[in-house]
């Protein structure tokens, strides 16, 4: 009987009752996420400072592009080969765990990309289509004579100079 009485629908003082919603909100210690206030003047200063630095970088790129556009296709091809050789040397240094700057990879790749872009712009001006351009590019790559990059030549010269110094 006791069990029946406790299950009855009449509310008792010891029974579970839920307080009204308004009291739940006021008694809660959690009032959402508190984000640190952002000083608008400092964020505006940061925004004002960034464009001039990026503008300077763009000017450097524009200067480099102007310089690249003055070169002939043969000069561009030579420089592309040299940079690709340097990239190969950087990869070798990385695999041998020697000292190298990781930023040099991106820098060299971007320079090669700029040179190839200038080369392609010239082809477009001449009316060369994509398909013919790829065909010409393949032919150019096949005609390349493999030779060591300038940095490797310098290392070889140092090694021969040291060998001669040891003999003397």
Curated annotation (Swiss-Prot):
Gene Ontology biological-process annotations: translation
Keyword Chloroplast part of the UniProt annotation: yes
UniProt main location, coarse: plastid
Segments for region (Disordered): 1-20
Gene3D superfamilies xref list: 1.10.287.310
Annotated family: Belongs to the universal ribosomal protein uL29 family.
Organism: Spinacia oleracea
Subunit structure, as described in the record: Component of the chloroplast large ribosomal subunit (LSU). Mature 70S chloroplast ribosomes of higher plants consist of a small (30S) and a large (50S) subunit. The 30S small subunit contains 1 molecule of ribosomal RNA (16S rRNA) and 24 different proteins. The 50S large subunit contains 3 rRNA molecules (23S, 5S and 4.5S rRNA) and 33 different proteins.
Keyword tags: Chloroplast, Plastid, Ribonucleoprotein, Ribosomal protein, Transit peptide
Transit peptide endpoints, chain numbering: 1-58
Protein name: Large ribosomal subunit protein uL29c
